């Protein structure tokens, strides 16, 4: 016999739960690396999402919303970077940003 719970609603933990933190490693494939134009495209993509996104390389971490920060990473062709996102749309942000990087920032070189 199961206990009668009446009209007591199930607890809602969504407001107290922390948003997920996800990360993904990707490699810069384009000839000129993460230069100004590529960094600008990356920032514009990152700004579409609510999640906080960081880019890490060689122990240095910068905001995905900072063109100068991204360029200061010095990520040339073949550089491995880690994308780290925290927020409710973290997976979508990582998917979109990784696709942008892996496509060579849509550059023709």
Annotate each language-model stretch with its function.
Residues 76-109:
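C-terminal structural segments of small proteins and small subunits
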Residues 19-23, 48, 78:
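A general secondary-structure signal for short beta-strands and their flanking turns/coil
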Residues 20, 69-71, 92, 98:
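Intrinsic-disorder/low-complexity peptide segments enriched for small residues
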Residues 27-76, 84:
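Compact, glycine-rich, soluble single-domain proteins
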Residues 1-25:
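SAM-dependent methyltransferases
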């Amino acid at each position: 016999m199961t206990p009668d719970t009446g009209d007591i609603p199930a607890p809602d933990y969504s407001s107290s739960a922390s948003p997920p933190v996800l990360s993904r490693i990707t490699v810069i494939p384009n000839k000129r690396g993460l230069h100004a134009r590529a960094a600008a495209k990356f920032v514009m993509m990152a700004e579409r999402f609510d999640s906080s996104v960081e880019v890490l390389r060689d122990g240095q971490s910068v905001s995905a919303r900072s063109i100068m920060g991204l360029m200061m990473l010095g990520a040339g062709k073949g550089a491995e970077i880690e994308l780290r996102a925290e927020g409710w749309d973290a997976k979508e942000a990582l998917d979109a940003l990784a696709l942008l990087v892996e496509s060579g920032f849509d550059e023709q070189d």
